[in-house]
Amino acid sequence: MDAHELSFRDGHGSSTSTMKDECASEEKALYLPGDSSFASVFGPSETVEDVETGPESTQDKPHSFNTQKPIREKLAGKNVAPFLARHIPEQYAPLGSQTGQPVEISSANSKYCYRHRPDLKCRRQADEPTMDKLQRSDQQGIAHAWSIFSAAPAKHRKLILQGIMAQCCFPQLSFISATVRDLIRIDFLTALPPEISFKILCYLDTTSLCKAAQVSRRWRALADDDVVWHRMCEQHIHRKCKKCGWGLPLLDRKRLRESKREIERRAATWDVSEQPAETESNSATIDTAASGSKRKPESDKEDTAMVKRQCTSIVSQSEQNEDYFKTRYRPWKEVYKDRFKVGTNWKYGRCSIRVFKGHSNGIMCLQFEDNILATGSYDATIKIWDTETGEELRTLKGHRSGIRCLQFDDTKLISGSMDHTLKVWNWRTGECISTYSGHRGGVVGLHFDATILASGSVDKTVKIWNFEDKSTCLLRGHTDWVNAVRVDSASRTVFSASDDCTVKLWDLDTKSCIRTFHGHVGQVQQVVPLPREFEFEDHDVECENDNVSVTSGDSPAASPQAIPGFDAQTSDTPSSAFGPAFDDGRPSPPRYIVTSALDSTIRLWETSSGRCLRTFFGHLEGVWALAADTLRIVSGAEDRMVKIWDPRTGKCERTFTGHSGPVTCIGLGDSRFATGSEDCEVRMYSFQT
């Protein structure tokens, strides 16, 4: 036996062997490893001399591959057969050895592989087209090698792999590396439970989610599910996302709240088989209006009921079971898509403009809801418009002087005039229901919330009207016209802005002033409480590169009024900062307010501390009109310009021009805003399309 054969049988090649010798030994190693390797895996076996005892024994012949091949085939069969019979008895057990009872496969060989689909076992079919090109004897050898590896336990597999790779040359190792790079990739969303998959997907942004939906049908079912997109809507709609900085227009809060419990249930009971096919464009779904669509649950009787998704209006009888929490709704992904489109239009100023003309004098107040717009003018009339068509629906006449303020809801419209009166109208019919006379001067500001109406007047007072018990009260403290009032029924407080350059916060229970805000050096025209969802971080005050607005450091903090039993030094919580009346669980007033004045500035205040957090500079003349939500502030001024501001950074994002007179009033919605001017026109900017 020569040195090369000894090296092959021992499984150790010489370090000085040529590539040709390595490749020659490679073919032999592929067919059957050395005896020592077999002994290490399958235990001691008979020698070649014990097997071949006939006259054609190879003891006197050279140990070439051709003479060794029949010997190795018999040796492989004798050594491999018991191993395969032990691990795969249903395929390799001798005939007659089975008793008719099904033989269970070893649990070690029946485990599912985490890398492949859970319904497929680790063993895979051979590459049949490639195998057909080989000789039958080679096919048998390769099949034996695959069978051994497939039947081997995990620790044996590692040992076999180590032995194979130890005999591989660099081209083969390179092939292994390239192949493993693809095989090592796992479909983790398929392997994981749905609730964990949803948790992972909720960390992705919208771009990554859309890419994930293109991987496979199952990934699309998971990535497009309402569980993921409802979370995305909660994170971005009506607020600024802290991660990406994006904020989308307002969606009906009630819909988000009603859907949250359903979404949580669906995440725990999700089944890909329940996901419907892609909805046709003409399927009957409840569309989303400009302010967002609503969801009304048809059944909510059991807290532990299973949730089943139903996107179309055709509900089969079996799906009307009370055990299911059913809703018909528009998918949250489509809702997010529409809101994202509107948000992008806001960001880049893409909008359509509709102009409403009809008043004969300057427009002083306006409000719009859905497709209804109401405007009040110095011509002593109120006009109702259809915002979709631009048509004037009706004109409300009754006041004897200019209309300075108005507000409407589904049932009524209340207006205030310089004729010292307030009127309640049925705006759908144009009928004047009642007239209230309580001020000694013109009514220039009003606001109602629930059953409380507040009005501000030229007579320097704020009057509170209670619709429920028909009571009224007068709040005195301002020394000049009261231009604007805002009621917060939850905390039972009222804000008022006056020409005396101050803003006051009133307690409706004690009929007293809680706090006065000082800082403006011009007549304060508007005060707007920000929604409670608005969040303002301290580091936002110290924003760098703020070329438009600066923090007001020279204005004094708001001064709390003298309240018996109230110590400002010991009041460190937001509730106690407003006095002892707010210590018993009573809701606090809105945390932030914005004000505008004829000093050409807008200010953002923290009500609990009275600090002016930011002053917005940009208008050239006095700011008459102001509106705000959680995403933006809109202002109109004597300089005929309308500006859009970011309340967190103070940056002026965009300026709109077009009016030929001072901008006196503004209405703000999630996808549009309207401005009124002394030029007798109303301009509505829509970002929906």
Swiss-Prot record:
Basic and acidic residues composition bias: residue spans? 1-12, 19-29, 295-306
Pathway entry: Protein modification; protein ubiquitination
Note the Gene3D superfamilies from the entry: 1.20.1280.50, YVTN repeat-like/Quinoprotein amine dehydrogenase
Q: Which PROSITE patterns match?
A: FBOX, WD_REPEATS_1, WD_REPEATS_2, WD_REPEATS_REGION
Give residue ranges of the WD repeats: 358-395, 398-437, 439-475, 477-518, 572-615, 616-655, 658-689
Q: Which InterPro entries match?
A: F-box-like_dom_sf, F-box_dom, G-protein_beta_WD-40_rep, Quinoprotein_ADH-like_sf, SCF_subunit_WD-repeat, WD40/YVTN_repeat-like_dom_sf, WD40_repeat_CS, WD40_rpt
**Pfam name, any one:** WD40
Where is this chain compositionally biased, Polar residues type?
276-291
Query: What sequence ranges are listed for the domain F-box?
Result: 186-232
Which Gene Ontology biological process is one annotated for this entry? protein ubiquitination
Recorded hits in CDD domains, A to Z, give: F-box_SpPof1-like, WD40
According to its UniProt record, which protein family does this protein belong to? Belongs to the WD repeat MET30/SCONB/SCON-2 family.
Q: How does it assemble?
A: Component of the SCF(sconB) E3 ubiquitin ligase complex.
Q: What does this protein do?
A: Component of the SCF(sconB) E3 ubiquitin ligase complex involved in the regulation of sulfur metabolite repression, probably by mediating the inactivation or degradation of the metR transcription factor.
Q: What is this protein called?
A: Probable E3 ubiquitin ligase complex SCF subunit sconB
What organism is this sequence from? Neosartorya fischeri (strain ATCC 1020 / DSM 3700 / CBS 544.65 / FGSC A1164 / JCM 1740 / NRRL 181 / WB 181) (Aspergillus fischerianus)
Organismal lineage: Eukaryota, Fungi, Dikarya, Ascomycota, Pezizomycotina
